[in-house]
Design a protein with these regions (language model features):
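Glycine-rich phosphate- or other oxyanion-binding loops that anchor nucleotides, phosphorylated ligands
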Residues: 42-78, 85, 89, 136
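N-terminal glycine-rich anion-binding loop in soluble enzyme alpha/beta folds
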Residues: 1-56
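Mixed-charge interfacial surface used for oligomerization/domain docking
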Residues: 1-21, 72, 79-83, 87-92, ...
Length: 280
């Protein structure tokens, strides 16, 4: 969330999306509150995301570079967006203007609050006094240990986006099937399993977490949960995590923004944690 990023002193650039041909900023719901956005989508509004442009990246970084600062930029996963490529091209261009400054672009290989969890960890390292180069090395290794598993109770937009076939979507709706998905090692999204009902989907996500988390059931680091207009489901995930992994006391629930939400629609809950091993 915007408040969380500000509390960690993390600077950010807005993503873009189109709603019925109108260009909008993904500005934490100020332009379109999530509930309104999903209502419009369900009513048939045309929605699509567009990546941050090279010019937008350069305009975002330039003030910091002019102040004599170096820039370490973490991008949304290249597995779900072309924005990493834009950032890399912007880096090449702006380096010509600021040859004495360091500019590094890192592919988070994550989305939503998984992307956020990596940036949060990086902010911790910055506050611990890591040098620029040490922070880059840390982030490139750490990104492989952020796990993200999620499920959805509404398959409409997964079908629309081609992630699930129409037949599977129809059957899934009739049989109350929730696809359980993850963020793969290459940063793309994949359907891993299918659960009958959200209770089983929630249980499976928490089970995977206990199997893969740093120190297993003794995991005591942060957990980030994102949801698209299904706060009670996110709360149910949080409660089960607290029951199964009692050492955790820092579980944050966030709202899925438009950049991811236009692909998932309402009814999606995503859970992110630090893993013991890199994602396979």
């Amino acid at each position: 969330s915007e408040k969380y990023l500000q509390s960690r002193d993390v600077k950010y650039v807005y993503f873009n999306y189109e709603l019925d041909g109108v260009q909008c900023k993904d500005d934490f719901g100020r332009t379109n509150a999530p509930a309104d956005l999903y209502k419009k989508m369900l009513a048939g509004a045309e929605c699509r995301t567009s990546q941050v442009s090279i010019g937008e990246y350069m305009a975002f970084w330039r003030p910091f570079l002019e102040e004599g600062k170096d820039v370490l930029h973490v991008s949304l996963s290249s597995g779900v967006s072309g924005t990493y490529e834009s950032a890399c091209q912007a880096k090449v261009e702006i380096e010509q203007e600021f040859p004495d400054r360091k500019i590094e672009v890192i592919d988070s290989l994550q989305a939503s609050s998984g992307y956020g969890l990596l940036v949060d960890g990086l902010a911790d390292k910055r506050d611990e006094g890591l040098s620029f180069d040490e922070a880059v090395t840390w982030a490139k290794e750490a990104r492989h240990r952020v796990y993200g598993w999620f499920f959805s109770t509404d398959l409409t937009f997964f079908v629309r986006g081609g992630r699930i076939s129409k037949t599977a979507g129809l059957l899934g709706g009739m049989l109350n099937i929730c696809p359980v998905m993850d963020v793969e090692a290459d940063g793309s999204l994949a359907v891993k399993e299918k659960a009958r009902g959200k209770k089983k989907a929630i249980a499976r996500v928490v089970e995977v977490m206990s199997q893969t988390a740093e120190q297993g059931n003794a995991y005591a680091r942060k957990v980030f949960i994102s949801n698209s207009e299904c706060a009670s489901d996110a709360q149910a995930v949080k409660e089960l995590i607290k029951e199964k992994l009692p050492q955790i006391d820092d579980i944050n629930i966030f709202t899925i923004g438009a950049t991811i939400g236009v692909h998932t629609g309402p009814g999606t809950v995503a859970t992110f944690w630090w893993g013991e091993e890199p994602r396979a």
